[in-house]
Regions:
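Short amphipathic alpha-helix used as the core "switch/output" element in two-component signaling
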Residues: 68, 90-102
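Acidic catalytic/metal-coordinating carboxylates
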Residues: 62, 88-91
Length: 146
């Protein structure tokens, strides 16, 4: 005895409803990195190094410039110098993580102390690198975070 297969031959006179529109995400399309350091040559080096790896990079030479860049823009990762010429990187870290809780922050300094390292992690930093920064190590850290 054979099996009988039924075929539904109902015609669809109306197209299937479209799914409701979704909100545009504030997340960046490609990982976006904010670099804050008061050393101009170091900023240029990091900008070049990170853009070569496909990141969208914004740089700031001061805490005020960094906070201005955060308005209306989402960053995946921030690289902050602990000692800024016109401000404190740890204080900036606190401000950035309050305004953007999902931001992953890597602190950098040429003068690490146990106190500054502890303070940075207490304020939300996820990594702490000593200058001169090893660029392959930095690239790997960012890749893991973004």
């Amino acid at each position: 005895m054979g099996s009988i297969n039924k075929i539904n031959s109902k015609r669809r006179d109306t197209p299937a409803p479209e799914p409701p529109p979704t909100e545009l995400s504030r997340e960046p399309v490609r990982p976006s990195i904010l670099v804050v350091d008061d050393e101009e040559n170091f900023l240029k080096l990091l900008h070049w190094f990170l853009t070569q790896r496909g990141y969208d990079v914004a740089t700031a030479a001061s805490a005020d410039d960094a906070l201005s860049l955060l308005n209306g823009r989402a960053f995946s990762v921030a690289l902050l110098d602990v000692k800024l010429g016109t401000g404190d990187g740890i204080h900036l870290l606190d401000q950035l993580t309050q305004r953007s809780p999902d931001l992953k922050v890597i602190m950098m300094t040429a003068y690490p102390t146990a106190g500054s390292i502890k303070q940075a992690f207490d304020k939300g930093a996820v990594r702490y690198l000593t200058k001169p920064v090893d660029l392959p190590e930095l690239a790997e850290a960012i890749k893991l975070l973004s």
